[in-house]
Amino acid sequence: MTQYTLKQASVLLQSKQISAVELASAYLAAIAEKNPALNGYITIDQDKTLAEARAADERIAQGNASALTGIPVAYKDIFCQTGWRSACASKMLDNFISPYTATVVQKLLDEGMVTLGRTNMDEFAMGSTNENSFYGAAKNPWNPEHVPGGSSGGSAAVVAARLAPAALGSDTGGSIRQPASHCGITGIKPTYGTVSRFGMVAYASSFDQAGPMAQTAEDCAILLNAMAGFDPKDSTSLEREKEDYTRDLNQPLKGLKIGLPKEYFGEGNSADVLTALQNTIDLLKAQGAELIEVSLPQTKLSIPAYYVLASAEASTNLSRYDGVRYGHRAAQFSDLEEMYGKTRAEGFGSEVKRRIMIGTYVLSHGYYDAYYLKAQKLRRLVADDFQTAFARCDLILAPTAPSAAPKIGADASPVETYLSDIYTIAVNLAGLPALTLPAGFSSGGLPIGVQLIGNYFSEAKILGAAHQIQLNSDWHGKRPE
């Protein structure tokens, strides 16, 4: 029962061939069996889950259900939900029970979706491997010696391991797409401002965006229909007419112009990644898509620009964790200043401290112009590159990551780890939508994904193209043993 896609489970629930309680119980049993080794979930509450499932069954019986009623979903530990621990995988919030619910979570609860639990992540969403979690690293379900990616590593792992049909992630510099690629599932980062950030713990406010993760592009489109929309509680939320993100699912690939950025196909990619890209290019050609070489010359500037800007925003956002109102507080201190210092030293992990220090430095007097303002200018150049490319093509095909998932504990420096986000970060700098979908496997049997990047508000076009690719391939149907 846990092998169904979201769409398949929806059909079975609506036709009353299975009940929401049966489906939730099957997932809870699978979680109890497999999660101790996987560590994809860090908070489970069977009683709450089954209560939501019973309520969903009542809605279905009364005939007022939506397509998502009764479907279980996992939430990255960055989303607040009343009565659930929302720790952001940090010691700082280990004892924080949220008094309110994130807008995007509330939207899915209103649809009748059933909460399975909170998934593991890099602390405060800072990381690319899930090794920065206070609760220990989640494992890659394809090979437990390897990372699932990050920061939404737990969400990617539980969907790939069939411990949830869908999950929510957040994407600040690639945190939905990179782990989805490493775990062999589909995930989309929408246009910045499409999905409300209210109740999603802030890392870098001008980058953060929530999105769905599932087995297929069709599942992601169904979820995005429920998630998107204006929210007056989020000042960055965009007021736009409601869209149907499933509208292009049946649009053929014939005539679609796909840009291939020459800077993304270079020596930095493993042979396995280049093979996966070539497989996708061959499929697109066979389906009648037109392939055009484009250039994104400022890509090389995206990593330094991103880590200056995101760290600056993080140092500001994380200043609220001071031990006064909520969260961890040091046990022993002699005055207020010592309490602040000890609380933050004990509560934050090393990567979070590193980014706070970088951010505080680049915002400090004498360095603001040299680093922060310069990075803002580079951000504009990166965004302009994409607009030049989209004048010639509808979508851009790119690698999601330069290689398959590395081993847990691989001796990479922070800079080497940051460089693994080279293909995802530019999209966040520009605020564009992008989706990753499975496109092959490495010689070691680990999944490899490719990215489809679109212009602003082209989610339906991206999801349609991805769905057509998935109709003509089976990478998304493969699952770990």
UniProtKB/Swiss-Prot annotation:
Q: What Gene3D superfamilies does the record point to?
A: Amidase signature (AS) domain
Record-listed E.C. numbers: 6.3.5.7
* GO molecular function term, any single one: glutaminyl-tRNA synthase (glutamine-hydrolyzing) activity
Q: Name one GO cellular component term.
A: glutamyl-tRNA(Gln) amidotransferase complex
Keywords attached to this entry: ATP-binding, Ligase, Nucleotide-binding, Protein biosynthesis
Q: Name one GO biological process term.
A: translation
Stored InterPro entries = Amidase, Amidase_CS, Amidase_dom, AS_sf, GatA
Asked if Nucleotide-binding is a keyword of the record, the answer is yes
Give the record's subunit note: Heterotrimer of A, B and C subunits.
The Swiss-Prot or TrEMBL record describes its family as follows: Belongs to the amidase family. GatA subfamily.
Give the protein's biological function: Allows the formation of correctly charged Gln-tRNA(Gln) through the transamidation of misacylated Glu-tRNA(Gln) in organisms which lack glutaminyl-tRNA synthetase. The reaction takes place in the presence of glutamine and ATP through an activated gamma-phospho-Glu-tRNA(Gln).
Q: What is this protein called?
A: Glutamyl-tRNA(Gln) amidotransferase subunit A
- What is the native source organism of this protein? Neisseria meningitidis serogroup A / serotype 4A (strain DSM 15465 / Z2491)
Q: What is the lineage of its organism?
A: Bacteria, Pseudomonadati, Pseudomonadota, Betaproteobacteria, Neisseriales
Q: Which gene encodes it?
A: gatA
